[in-house]
Structures are given as C-alpha cells and as structure tokens.
Amino acid sequence: MVRHPSTTAGIFARRFFARTVLLATALVFGSAIATEENAELAPLASHWLLLDIARSGASLVAVGDHGHILVSTDQGNTWTQSPAPTRAMLTGVAFPDPLHGWTVGHDGVILATVDGGKTWRRQDDGKNSDAIYLDVFFHDAAHGFVVGAYGKFLATDDGGKTWTARQPAVGEVHYNRITAGPEGHLYLAGEGGTLLISTDGGSNWTKSEVPYEGSLFGALPLDQGGIIVYGLRGHILRSDDHGANWTPHNSETKVLIMGGLRLKNGLIILGGQGGNFFLSRDSGKTFTLWQQTGFGTSVADLIEAEDGSVVTVGEAGAVRIKLP
C-alpha cells in the first residue's frame, strides 16, 4: 500500500497559506526537535508532498515535506532519497552548477550540498527557528539569496557560510519566489501584487506596479523584456517592457497557479490546483486551459527534463506528464 502523509491536501494548502501569510505561527508546525532530527528514509518518498524541483547537471532534485530530498538520474522516471539533517518542510531548492546546491524551508532551515544532492549539511545557525523560508537562488557557488515570509531576505557572498539580512524596501511582505531572467535581471514575486526587479544582481530593487493586489507566486521571464506573472484565482499578467506596463489574461478559471515553465520549443506551461494547466504557444499573449486526463492533483512546480518531457512536483509527489 502506498503510504501518504496524513492530510496531504491540507499540508499542500498550508504551503499556499504560507505564501499568503494566512497561517502565521501555525505554519511553523514543526519544532526544534523536528528541525534537528534527520529525515526519515521512506521507500515511497517520491509519492509524498513535494514543493520544488531543480536541475543539477543531468540530474533532477526535488524537495518537500518531512525533509525529503529526492534525486533522479533518469529524467524523473525513478527517484532516490538523499539523507537530510532535518524533518522540516523544504520549500525551495537551487543549483547554480551541477555540484553546489541549496534547499530552504520551515524552521529557518538552510541546507547545502557539494556533491549534486547526494549528501547535505546544515548552514543555518538555528537562531532563526521561527523563520519560514520559501525560496532560494544562487548566481554561482558563492553568491545567493534566501527569501521568505514576513519580508525575510538573506544574502551571502561566501557560499552560505555567513548570511546577511537585507530589506528591499517594501516592508514585511511575503516573498514567494525569486527568479533570474535571460538578461540577468532578477524578479522577486510576493503577496499584495508585489513584483520587485533588480538589474544589478540583487543589490537594488525597483517595484513594478502590477495591476493586481493579490498574491503572486512566481514570475516567468521571457526574451526582450517580456515577463509573465501568476498567482491567486487564476490571475496571469504579461509585460513586454520589463514590467513597466501590464496586460491581464482571462484564464477562465479561479484556480491558484503555483508554477511556470517555458520549454525549449517555446511552449509556456503554467500549473496549479486540481491538475489545471495553462498552455501558451505565442509567448504568453494567449493561454488555453488544459486538464490532463486522470491528473487531478495540485502542482507546486514543474521542470523540463533533458529528454523534453515535463516533470511536475506537488500533492502527488513527482509526476511526469505528457503534453497535448
């Protein structure tokens, strides 16, 4: 029998709430004990709740609930769980190169790897156990950022040995996801329609006036100044001029959209609640709602494997999907 964590849908929903500051301290449902313990090795961990996925060279690395870290060397067909020194919920993972990677999550946890995700060590000092980190980004093996709830924004220039708190001058909004564009710009999406843009590697940030006041869960940078942002209640907006002006898209549904991806062939796919996907073949000018038959679970993120397939992570763990 497949063993699933109890109330999987509820845990998935709590991550949504984490990114919209509706749970406050209830989100830190773990404790110092859970943070300090090693993750339990579960034979079917790839079927548990997973919240983010990244590429590590030719491999894929996914992270999620109970400190689970999974590595796939065959494009997401099979997964191997890596030992992790925490049982906290992990919400973000990033690899600037095939060997160096970081994952972050609840209870102020920051983990690092130098072998492509096979082994991990703690980098946080345990003093921020009440922090909820939601995403991580690294330019290279030395310079990176961690962002999260209540305006948490940490920076490092020594590979995570030390972290410095910064404030991009917006207040204590929840920062949900940080993304790099093809021109080197950084995009930081958050609650209250927040989209911050940096053109200097993250030292300074400018707020884009997005005509939407709900939470944004991500930004998908395109070529030549194009950006797509997405979030609550099916909201999708597109800019052609680095965020100066925005055009909303009618998604025909009110589902929450959590992840976005542009494939090598140019197809854009956004994924969210209930197995709802939004596809665009014209650089985000128009979207078509698509529901894969038999796929009814919620998606937190998605990535293109080297063989051109799409691997999703979310409520049902890691799942390869076949696009129409």
Identify the function of each model-found stretch:
Residues 4-21:
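Bacterial N-terminal signal peptides that target proteins for export
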Residues 18-30:
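Bacterial N-terminal signal peptides
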